[in-house]
């Protein structure tokens, strides 16, 4: 019996363990997916932030670019970094790149700042009385290196003196092309474009010598760089890297020829937005630079004329030689080879052969378009390029005749002009031709026919595009959601007091995007490190900037515009704080991976198979799939967190019972008195109800109480002797109901009875629950036993029928084999009989003939 009872107890324990295991494993067997928040994923979107510039400007230099760079740019990073992104394919479009617009605005700001302190030539919009000027030309200039001399006019005009109410007459030399005749009078002139253009005189020390400028993205943003050779500037790029800043770009303002730019890698590259439009510019990037050496010989005497209070006009007092005559030299052999390669590249781009491509001179337009215009040593050169844009290019030294203009149309805005004061002495500048700006006479619509390309210019954005074609700015979006099988543990009956650990700072900012080409599963492993890199990169960039400014504090002079660019770098810190605020609204503050209670909807991407998205997709690809649902998911996360906080608040109210010391707080005594009075009232009411129920029960049994305060003795049985003094006889068995007197004994008696009753009730309830659990355990155990028996029976049946089927199959195969063998034997025997009959036919004929003869 003891052994049976022990086995019974073991079976009961086993049944309870089985029930608990089933209850715990039931949630694990479900395949429902839940929303999981990931912070630090390598995801980005196209953006147009305010970029800031960096340069190695020298504050002691008076050149305009240096002055502007010291006031608008920060020092360059001494250790620039570039991180390649494997397995990343990104789209670029040089024709719709906000970086070009920003650089264009910056160069306009540079020129405006260079011309801002200089004199407006509005007072010179007066009538000029001019006559032909006679002076001796220099004899050292040949016809090969100079243009034909131009006639000069000696003009007199009235200007305001230091006293505004008085005027005086002054004299100045002007070339004929800088003045326009008025009316029919031969001696009356005015300055060209004076009535339609606001002309600003450039400062005498302005040289416009460009220095390399780097464009950098603020922290929280990144610059993606396409490293594909022969990249057309638009489309997919497979070799992508991320950088802090671009390479150094020299903002050279020029037309027709690209000077001192970057060279192509591999082959000459041709880039055009729309080939079917003959107005679009074809940007040609060379592989090998061609030297361009320009020189302005001669000398002149520059004078100063006061044209008003505090306004000085720098004029030409005397001329020695033709100071407006200049020339540029190009190696004809190198240029001829370059032109042939350019023709091949244009032919390949337009689906033609090189024989169908022709280069010709500019057809017409403004002087800035028909000539190669550029600034050399503070003077604006206008060079005739008809000798190099032709099919008959000499192999010797090609000399391009140039002219220097004093009044130049401004490329920055319509209706503006620049007066360049004459520069003393010889001017020489050596440059490198790195590209061409061309237009086609006819649209490229088919694969046949000849094409003629001509040099063009005027839109300076094309120059910036030739350098920024391989860059784009993106905004890093480190916050993403994805489906997983894990669910957040929510508050049920006890307060979750687990503290979230804050992660530290470290690593590099660019390394954050290093896992962009990895799958979601591989990148998710390093989310904590990437989240650290995100904020660490922001802090590191700020520290690098502050160190660079501190190191060059005596050189750096930030203007208001420069401070604005500097403040743009603080945008990333604000974005990081915003992301942390959003994570806080979802209950995920300080976590790189945060599980939630929001179920993943079956209509959302990735609901069918999570293994496919985690093993095959990158975070960038996944973000494109789920981008249409993120708004709804974010809203559900906020609602779930609000409900979670409500549950925690409700539970927090019960958490006051956790501290016993709070029970003795004097502020809660009134609450204790109230509870005591309510308890006493409840006990008294319960006592009255129990008394009434007791009286009713006894009355129903035939009992009529005389008084509730009188002891009622129980009648003694007849025939019994009473108790005597000597102790004889039987003890009296009469009893009386115990009467409790006083308030406290009454309360104690009621509490005792209530406690006993509660204990008995709870004990009975516990016993019933235990019996039910044992019954349920026996039932489950019995069910499992029956299931095992049924499975064993099913296995036996399957084994039996499998054996029978095997035997039947073998028998069928044997019978088939026997039948086939017998049939084959009969066929062979019949065939043999037929052959014997055929073989015996001659014998039978012979035997018949023998019988006939006999």
Swiss-Prot record:
Motif Di-leucine internalization motif mapped to chain: 853-854
GO BP field: clathrin-dependent endocytosis of virus by host cell; fusion of virus membrane with host endosome membrane; fusion of virus membrane with host plasma membrane; positive regulation of plasma membrane raft polarization; positive regulation of receptor clustering; viral protein processing; virion attachment to host cell
Site annotation Cleavage: residues: 500-501
Residue span of region V1: 130-154
GO terms of molecular function: structural molecule activity
Stretches for region V3: 294-327
Short motif (YXXL motif): ranges: 703-706
Cross-referenced CDD domains: HIV-1-like_HR1-HR2
Immunosuppression: annotated span: 564-582
The entry's keywords: AIDS, Apoptosis, Clathrin-mediated endocytosis of virus by host, Cleavage on pair of basic residues, Coiled coil, Disulfide bond, Fusion of virus membrane with host endosomal membrane, Fusion of virus membrane with host membrane, Glycoprotein, Host cell membrane, Host endosome, Host membrane, Host-virus interaction, Lipoprotein, Membrane, Palmitate, Signal, Transmembrane, Transmembrane helix, Viral attachment to host cell, Viral envelope protein, Viral immunoevasion, Viral penetration into host cytoplasm, Virion, Virus endocytosis by host, Virus entry into host cell
Pfam families: GP120, GP41
Region of interest (MPER), residue spans: 653-674
Region (V2): 155-194
Region described as Fusion peptide: spans on this chain: 501-522
Region described as V4: spans on this chain: 383-402
Entry's Gene Ontology cellular component terms: host cell endosome membrane; host cell plasma membrane; membrane; viral envelope; virion membrane
PTM annotation: Highly glycosylated by host. The high number of glycan on the protein is reffered to as 'glycan shield' because it contributes to hide protein sequence from adaptive immune system.
Keyword presence, Transmembrane: yes
Positions annotated with a glycan in the UniProt record: 134, 140, 143, 154, 158, 186, 195, 239, 260, 267, 274, 299, 331, 336, 351, 356, 384, 392, 426, 432, 446, 450, 601, 608, 616, 628
Positions of disulphide bridges: 53-73, 118-203, 125-194, 130-155, 216-245, 226-237, 294-328, 376-429, 383-402, 588-594
Misc. comment: Inhibitors targeting HIV-1 viral envelope proteins are used as antiretroviral drugs. Attachment of virions to the cell surface via non-specific interactions and CD4 binding can be blocked by inhibitors that include cyanovirin-N, cyclotriazadisulfonamide analogs, PRO 2000, TNX 355 and PRO 542. In addition, BMS 806 can block CD4-induced conformational changes. Env interactions with the coreceptor molecules can be targeted by CCR5 antagonists including SCH-D, maraviroc (UK 427857) and aplaviroc (GW 873140), and the CXCR4 antagonist AMD 070. HIV-1 lineages are divided in three main groups, M (for Major), O (for Outlier), and N (for New, or Non-M, Non-O). The vast majority of strains found worldwide belong to the group M. Group O seems to be endemic to and largely confined to Cameroon and neighboring countries in West Central Africa, where these viruses represent a small minority of HIV-1 strains. The group N is represented by a limited number of isolates from Cameroonian persons. The group M is further subdivided in 9 clades or subtypes (A to D, F to H, J and K).
Domain description: Some of the most genetically diverse regions of the viral genome are present in Env. They are called variable regions 1 through 5 (V1 through V5). Coreceptor usage of gp120 is determined mainly by the primary structure of the third variable region (V3) in the outer domain of gp120. The sequence of V3 determines which coreceptor, CCR5 and/or CXCR4 (corresponding to R5/macrophage, X4/T cell and R5X4/T cell and macrophage tropism), is used to trigger the fusion potential of the Env complex, and hence which cells the virus can infect. Binding to CCR5 involves a region adjacent in addition to V3.
UniProt family annotation: Belongs to the HIV-1 env protein family.
Protein name, per record: Envelope glycoprotein gp160
Provenance organism: Simian immunodeficiency virus (isolate CPZ GAB1) (SIV-cpz)
């Amino acid at each position: 019996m003891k052994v049976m009872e022990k086995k019974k107890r073991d079976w009961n324990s086993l049944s309870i363990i089985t029930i608990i295991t089933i209850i715990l494993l039931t949630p694990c067997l479900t395949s429902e997916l839940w929303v999981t928040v990931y912070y630090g994923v390598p995801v980005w979107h196209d953006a147009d932030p305010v970029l800031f510039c960096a340069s190695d400007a020298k504050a002691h230099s008076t050149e305009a670019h240096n002055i502007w760079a010291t006031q608008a740019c920060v020092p360059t990073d001494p250790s620039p970094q570039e991180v390649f992104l494997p397995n990343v394919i990104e789209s670029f479009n040089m024709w719709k790149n906000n970086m070009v617009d920003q650089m264009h605005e910056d160069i306009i700001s540079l020129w405006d700042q260079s011309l801002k302190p200089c004199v407006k030539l509005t007072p010179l919009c007066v009538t000029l009385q001019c006559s032909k000027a006679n002076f001796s030309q220099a004899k050292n200039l040949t016809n090969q290196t100079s243009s034909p001399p131009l006639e000069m006019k000696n003009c007199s005009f009235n200007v305001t003196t230091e006293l505004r109410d008085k005027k005086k007459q002054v004299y100045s030399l002007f070339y004929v092309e800088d003045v326009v005749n008025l009316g029919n009078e031969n001696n009356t002139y005015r300055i060209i474009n004076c009535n339609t253009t606001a002309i600003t005189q450039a400062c005498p020390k302005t040289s416009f010598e460009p220095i390399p400028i780097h464009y950098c993205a603020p922290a929280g943003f990144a610059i993606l760089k396409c490293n594909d050779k022969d990249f057309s500037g638009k489309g997919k790029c497979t070799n992508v890297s991320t950088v802090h800043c671009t390479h150094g770009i020299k903002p050279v303002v020029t037309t027709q020829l690209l000077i001192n730019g970057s060279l192509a890698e591999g082959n000459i590259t041709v880039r055009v937005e729309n080939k079917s439009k003959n107005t679009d510019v074809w940007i040609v990037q060379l592989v090998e630079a061609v030297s361009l050496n320009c020189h302005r010989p001669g000398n002149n005497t520059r004078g100063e004329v006061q044209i008003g209070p505090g306004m000085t006009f720098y004029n030409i007092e005397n001329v020695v030689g033709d100071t407006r005559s200049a020339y540029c030299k190009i190696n004809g052999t190198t240029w001829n080879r370059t032109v042939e390669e350019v023709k091949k590249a244009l032919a390949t781009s337009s689906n033609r052969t090189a024989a169908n491509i022709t280069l010709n001179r500019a057809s017409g337009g403004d002087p800035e378009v028909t000539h190669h215009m550029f600034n050399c040593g503070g003077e604006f050169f206008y060079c005739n390029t008809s000798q190099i844009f032709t099919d008959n290019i000499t192999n010797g030294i090609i000399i391009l005749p140039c002219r220097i203009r004093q009044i130049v149309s401004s490329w920055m805005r319509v209706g503006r002009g620049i007066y360049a004061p004459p520069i003393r002495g010889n001017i020489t500048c050596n440059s490198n031709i790195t590209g061409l700006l061309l237009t086609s006479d006819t649209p490229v619509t088919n694969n046949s026919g000849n094409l003629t390309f001509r040099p063009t210019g005027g839109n300076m954005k094309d120059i910036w595009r030739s350098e920024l074609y391989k860059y784009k700015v993106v905004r890093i979006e480190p916050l993403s959601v994805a489906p997983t099988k894990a669910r957040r543990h929510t508050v049920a009956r006890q307060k979750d007091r687990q503290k979230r650990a804050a992660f530290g700072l470290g690593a590099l900012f660019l390394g954050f995007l290093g896992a962009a080409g990895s799958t979601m599963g591989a990148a998710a492993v390093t989310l904590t490190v990437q989240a650290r890199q995100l904020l660490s990169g922001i802090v590191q960039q700020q520290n690098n900037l502050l160190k660079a400014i501190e190191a060059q504090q005596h050189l750096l002079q930030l203007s208001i515009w420069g401070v604005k660019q500097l403040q743009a770098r603080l945008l990333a810190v604000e974005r990081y704080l915003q992301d942390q605020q959003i994570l806080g609204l979802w209950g995920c503050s300080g976590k790189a991976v945060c599980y939630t209670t929001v179920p993943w909807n079956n209509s959302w991407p990735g609901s069918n198979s999570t293994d496919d998205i985690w093993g095959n997709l990158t975070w960038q690809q996944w973000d494109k799939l789920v981008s249409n649902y993120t708004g709804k998911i974010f809203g559900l996360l906020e609602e779930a967190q609000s409900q979670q906080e409500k549950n925690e608040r409700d539970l927090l109210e019960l958490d006051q019972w956790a501290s016993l010391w709070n029970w003795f707080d004097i502020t809660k005594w009134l609450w204790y008195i109230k509870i005591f009075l309510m308890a006493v009232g409840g006990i008294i009411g319960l006592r009255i109800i129990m008394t009434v129920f007791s009286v009713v029960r006894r009355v129903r049994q035939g009992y009529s109480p005389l008084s509730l305060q009188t002891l009622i003795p129980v009648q003694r049985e007849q025939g019994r002797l009473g108790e005597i003094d000597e102790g004889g006889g039987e003890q009296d068995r009469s009893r009386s109901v115990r009467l409790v007197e006083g308030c406290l004994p009454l309360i104690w008696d009621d509490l005792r009875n209530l406690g006993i009753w509660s204990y008995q009730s709870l004990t009975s309830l516990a016993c019933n629950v235990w019996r039910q659990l044992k019954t349920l355990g026996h039932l489950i155990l019995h069910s499992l036993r029956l299931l095992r028996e049924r499975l064993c029976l099913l296995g036996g049946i399957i084994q039996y029928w499998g054996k029978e089927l095997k035997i039947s199959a073998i028998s069928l195969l044997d019978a088939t084999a026997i039948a086939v063998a017998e049939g084959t034997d009969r066929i062979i025997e019949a065939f043999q009989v037929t052959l014997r009959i055929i073989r015996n036919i001659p014998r039978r004929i012979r035997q018949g003939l023998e019988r006939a003869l006999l």
